[in-house]
UniProtKB/Swiss-Prot annotation:
Task performed by this protein: Functions in the N-end rule pathway of protein degradation where it conjugates Leu from its aminoacyl-tRNA to the N-termini of proteins containing an N-terminal aspartate or glutamate.
Gene Ontology terms: cellular component: cytoplasm
EC number(s) on file: 2.3.2.29
Family the UniProt entry places it in: Belongs to the R-transferase family. Bpt subfamily.
Keyword tRNA-binding: no
NCBIfam families: PRK01305.1-3, PRK01305.2-2, PRK01305.2-3, PRK01305.2-4
Primary location: cytoplasm
Gene name for this UniProt entry: bpt
Matches recorded under InterPro entries: Acyl_CoA_acyltransferase (IPR016181), Asp_Glu_LeuTrfase (IPR017138), N-end_Aminoacyl_Trfase (IPR030700), N-end_Aminoacyl_Trfase_C (IPR007472), N-end_Aminoacyl_Trfase_N (IPR007471)
Protein name: Aspartate/glutamate leucyltransferase
Reactions this protein catalyses: N-terminal L-glutamyl-[protein] + L-leucyl-tRNA(Leu) = N-terminal L-leucyl-L-glutamyl-[protein] + tRNA(Leu) + H(+); N-terminal L-aspartyl-[protein] + L-leucyl-tRNA(Leu) = N-terminal L-leucyl-L-aspartyl-[protein] + tRNA(Leu) + H(+)
Localization per record: Cytoplasm
Record keywords, A-Z: Acyltransferase, Cytoplasm, Transferase
HAMAP family: Bpt (MF_00689)
Length: 238
């Protein structure tokens, strides 16, 4: 594959097969790009064909006998919050939010609490600062942090990549003690708001996995598009 920006060939490798971390009994295999020549312009193009970022590496599922991971994105100019999502926004009107490129100890402390209490049975447990930085940070594309505050207390963080045509939601985490606020939903809605303010065309939400309850929430934000073998298609769900 060549980048139009530099005409530099980009090597695409393939990982070994390993147990899937999302679906029991399935095996996972990834196409992986990890090159010094990667840049935000090329990454925006790779997002459009189903790739994602983890640290400085770009990957896309290429599993032997499974195609459950469906790339999903929101066309921002068409997105309208549902009644439930409007209630979430109204319920959290007392909170403030800000955009920053600064990484802080408070962000990591909240991440550590979130993983320990919400994902103690997953592959990201136990949390560590090294794992956190390797997962979220990228030398060729520093992430943006959307921070949500109750007064001076940090409640939630959305780690987001800012590209020329889109935003890409990398990871979100929040205070597990504030479950009634639906902070996970609030963070997606704030990313939609930011994308609209920045006149972006899409918000990429990663992979929709219908068979995994923890990964099936993304269809609640409509309209959305799913990447199929025929290209990006609007959902037919009413």
């Amino acid at each position: 594959m060549n980048s139009n920006a530099s005409n530099t060939p980009i090597a695409i490798g393939i990982s070994q097969i390993f147990p899937c971390s999302y679906l029991d009994g399935q095996q996972e295999q990834l196409l992986v790009i990890q090159e010094e020549t990667l840049d935000p312009i090329l990454f925006d193009r790779l997002l459009a064909i189903g790739f994602r970022r983890s640290g400085s590496a770009i990957y896309k599922p290429r599993c032997p006998r499974c195609s459950a991971c469906q790339p999903i994105r929101l066309p921002i100019k068409e997105f309208t919050p549902s009644k439930r999502q409007k209630r979430t926004l109204a319920h959290n009107r007392d909170l403030t939010w800000r955009i920053t490129s600064e990484h802080t100890e408070a962000q990591y402390a909240l991440y550590e609490k979130y993983i320990r209490e919400r994902h103690f049975d997953g592959p990201m447990f136990p949390p560590s600062k090294t794992q956190y930085e390797q997962f979220l940070f990228c030398h060729w594309l520093p992430p943006t942090f959307i921070e949500v505050y109750d007064g001076n207390r940090l409640l939630a963080v959305a780690v987001t990549d800012t590209l020329s045509n889109s935003l890409s939601a990398i990871y979100s985490y929040f205070d597990p003690d504030e479950e009634r606020r639906s902070l996970g939903s609030l963070l997606i809605l704030l990313q939609c708001r930011l994308a609209k303010l920045q006149d972006k065309e899409f918000l990429y939400l990663g992979y929709q996995i219908d068979a995994n309850r923890k990964m099936s929430y993304k269809r609640l934000y409509r309209p959305y598009q799913i990447l199929t073998p025929q290209g990006w298609e609007y959902s037919q769900v009413c």
